[in-house]
Amino acid sequence: LANLCYSRRVPCYMISSREENEERRETNNSRLMQWFGAHVIPCEKSQIAQTVRETMEMLSAKGYRPYYIYGNQYGTGNEGVPVQAYVDAYEEICTYEAEQRIHFEYIFFPSGTGATQSGLISGHLLRKDQRKIMGVLISSREKERAEQVIWQGIQDYFQKREIPLTPVSQEEIHLLCQYKAGGYGKYNQEIIRVIKEEFCRNGIPMDPTYTGKAFWGMKEYLREKKIADSQILFIHTGGTPLFYDCLGNEEV
């Protein structure tokens, strides 16, 4: 987002929250933010809403018309907006399947804010096809809250397009919460092992916060459920700068 704002000459402000007493350190992402000229506003996690409100008021007083990508100060209201991006991605997947004459029975990916999962499930519901959309939760959210956010995104998307949903539609939310490894940004040595293995074998960079954790979770799930001989797609959602942060970590 900061990159796009820079290219369009739109001022970018980022509210950067952290846990109490959490040490703030420089990362490749933070260095890129500096390159893009983004204004980073730190705050405690308990003060996000207040900081968003104060920042919006400050920018309005300067004559700007600020837009908060999550909606209101509490982060609600825009759940349906990013969904279209992954509805489009779902269509690309279906096109690829038709060209290659294959069908993915499972689609796995990291699930954090819920936007990716809302979009993929929406595309799946519109297509009315048969498969399981499997989000691997990488945040510290509780399962009930995480599923609520995903469902809200789906509802917003369908309501704005005046397309009916049925209660059965909610049953298409498959969220794996048992592979969080302690919560957001935390990981174990098994996750690191999987990251090393995938990079050395296939040249694919993953990170322990998002893609690496989700890929590990997917492999664990497939092993535990004894799923074999199935067509499976894993969506790499980005995060390459975090891979290089991982390389510089003395624990790796």
Regions found by a protein language model. Give the residues of each.
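Short glycine/serine/threonine-rich phosphate/pyrophosphate-binding segments
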Residues: 1, 7, 113-120, 212-215, ...
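Alpha-helix C-terminal capping segments
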Residues: 1-11, 121-128, 217-226
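A glycine-rich helix N-cap at a beta->alpha junction
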Residues: 10-54
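Short beta-strand segments
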Residues: 15-16, 43, 68-72, 110-111, ...
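Phosphate/diphosphate-binding glycine-rich loops and adjacent basic-rich segments that engage nucleotide
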Residues: 55-88, 93
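Glycine-rich phosphate/pyrophosphate-binding loop at beta-loop-alpha junctions
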Residues: 83-174, 236-252
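Active-site-adjacent helical/loop segments in soluble small-molecule enzymes
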Residues: 169-229
